[in-house]
Amino acid sequence: AWSQATKKHIKTSLTLYIRSMQKQLAPMGYHYRADDIEGKQHLEHVIPQNKIINAYLHGFITAEQALQMPLCIISDSDKHLLEGDWQQSGNWQYPFRRYQSAGYTKTIRSVDGRVIDMQKHTLDGHFAMLGIKA
């Protein structure tokens, strides 16, 4: 059996690798972008990265899905809105709903320019946009 330190090292390394690959694989380094970004930008994991890693490690999602999870550019000044508890408003099927419940009101568009309906946009729809089987 591996020590806790070894397990932690593996998970940290895996997280860094996945984060770097997610940015490389996303069409423009991201999949979604908020309108009216002022000042510094923040690349947001629509589903928190720790949730993605744990889901992958427990076999709930494939490696391809983990590497292609939605990334959204928002204003750095807005990121505090989304730092709330994923447990309360997190939703794998409808990942943007937590933006709504956090009070985020800016329009978000996909890389192909379509406005995202935060209430209805699904993770399956995200993967379909990328041509990935959900």
Please name every model-derived segment.
Residues Q65-W92:
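Short Cys/His-centered divalent metal-binding micro-motifs
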Residues A1-E38, G84-A134:
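Nuclease and nuclease-like effector domains acting on nucleic acids or nucleotide cofactors
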Residues I52-G59, L82-W86, S110:
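Generic local-structure boundary detector
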Residues D35-L67:
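Histidine-centered nuclease catalytic patch
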Residues H42, C72-D76, I108:
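A structural signal for short, well-ordered beta-strand segments and their strand-loop junctions
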